[in-house]
Amino acid sequence: MQPAMLLGLLGAAALAAVSSAPVDNRDHNEEMVTRCIIEVLSNALSKSSVPTITPECRQVLKKSGKEVKGEEKGENQNSKFEVRLLRDPADASGTRWASSREDAGAPVEDSQGQTKVGNEKWTEGGGHSREGVDDQESLRPSNQQASKEAKIYHSEERVGKEREKEEGKIYPMGEHREDAGEEKKHIEDSGEKPNTFSNKRSEASAKKKDESVARADAHSMELEEKTHSREQSSQESGEETRRQEKPQELTDQDQSQEESQEGEEGEEGEEGEEGEEDSASEVTKRRPRHHHGRSGSNKSSYEGHPLSEERRPSPKESKEADVATVRLGEKRSHHLAHYRASEEEPEYGEESRSYRGLQYRGRGSEEDRAPRPRSEESQEREYKRNHPDSELESTANRHGEETEEERSYEGANGRQHRGRGREPGAHSALDTREEKRLLDEGHYPVRESPIDTAKRYPQSKWQEQEKNYLNYGEEGDQGRWWQQEEQLGPEESREEVRFPDRQYEPYPITEKRKRLGALFNPYFDPLQWKNSDFEKRGNPDDSFLEDEGEDRNGVTLTEKNSFPEYNYDWWERRPFSEDVNWGYEKRSFARAPQLDLKRQYDGVAELDQLLHYRKKADEFPDFYDSEEQMGPHQEANDEKARADQRVLTAEEKKELENLAAMDLELQKIAEKFSQRG
């Protein structure tokens, strides 16, 4: 039975091996494998000494095993490749991706066709030949190449978007329309054609730009009509200042054109920047123009230093540009509500122009960023901007000079610093006129925070103002009080100056007692007898009570002191103080009463008292009964109960005597404890 079972098992194994072996159209390999398996089985069963596998059979079996492994690898790689294709979505809008697909189209199609043919062979015959596997392995690089190109395209797209964002940040918010026109001309001359995306974007931004320009023009026209109808004198002064500004603007424009030409010669322009500049100018036009007169100075200052169009700055330069624009925005918003129109302050316009010019030059090419020698006027302006205290002093010193330019500049400064704690009486006539004019135009003064005022004024000025304020309208001794008070401390010093004969305690004695006693003495007496006379000595507001001897209700202070005040907090704090001062009883047992022992035996004394009362009640029942009058019914019941009581036996009497003796002993013990306590 055993050889038959072995033969059956070996036959089943042979069939399984034959079915798992690769079948290639029932060719020679299958036959060789089956023969080898049968030979091995027969040799193993018949002859134990003969080697079971011949070298030829061994080679055939090795080949079949390699083919099976190769097919499994091919299947795994096919599935991986299909998953990768699903994960990498194709972007139909990208031109580069389309071209890369056209280049790699033929090998991809061939590989797909061959994989399909290979799959058909596998389904029909149950396996693959070695040649199919080799073809598939040769096709693998083309598929990997396609996926790599797709990834490269996506990374390039991301880099392009980030570059556009950086360029959008770098360009200043207030670039003028003329810069965009120059850039268009330059792009047409150089022959660079923007792509379709930038064309669409530039068309949309141009439409929005025209709409915003129309709105801004309408708004400026309304403001012009209002200002012209209300004030004619301001127009005349504006014309004079414009005449002075025109030559300056022309020189600034010439400088800006030279700078832009140098930048254009140095670097080439990039695609798609036209649309971004249009959008940047559109954002600035959407901003509401609160002051029509101010817009002229902004315009001229931006025209004076335009950036060259074709520049791609580094990330460091972009960060510096962001910081500069934020500073400009903060400065503009701070001075928004209390500056004069640029027509009336030419010096302020020049100052802002030079400041912005310095900010913008830091963003240009290396030639523009080279340090240029500054004139003495620009250095003085920077010093004034950084040190407003010295500016105020200089304006006060120059007040005697009578030139028109200095008057207008001082007037602008006076109005700018109005509401910031200025000294009374300076430029009062000018301020009233300008206030009326600004209120008519709808401008309101903005109050400055105390931190800004403290920064602007030096310490000496603050002290002088305080002294003037304290001595103002006061004569004789009162003026001396305030001066002495400045030398002394706050509230206490005032009272010491006012009442020099009084005696003051450094700290209330009762408070000291409370704190020290509660902390260091666990047996601190909680009943504190407060003396209001001592406590009120330190309070100057109650001085009149000491003189009169009575308070408002007519009760004297001595009557108030007759009642103690109970300290409830002491009992809550006591356990904590016991834990802290655990060795206090050993150190000072002679002074402190032993309250703990007394408390322990209070219960024993109470029990003794109750027993005593019980004993007395047994001896004199009629005396210790309740005092309520008993009714006739209750009296009859009591008489019946007494009649029912039987006479006590000798044993019961002995028990009662023993109980009485125990009661007496307990009473003696309680008396001893109470005497000790």
Swiss-Prot record:
**InterPro entries (alphabetical):** Chromogranin_AB, Chromogranin_CS, Granin
Q: How does it assemble?
A: Interacts with ITPR1 in the secretory granules.
Principal cellular location given in the protein's record = secreted
Name used for this protein in its record? Secretogranin-1
Q: Which UniProt keywords apply?
A: Cleavage on pair of basic residues, Disulfide bond, Glycoprotein, Phosphoprotein, Proteoglycan, Secreted, Signal, Sulfation
Q: Which GO terms describe its cellular component?
A: extracellular region; secretory granule
Please note every region of biased composition (Basic and acidic residues).
64-90, 118-133, 148-192, 200-249, 306-322, 363-409, 421-455, 491-504, 635-646
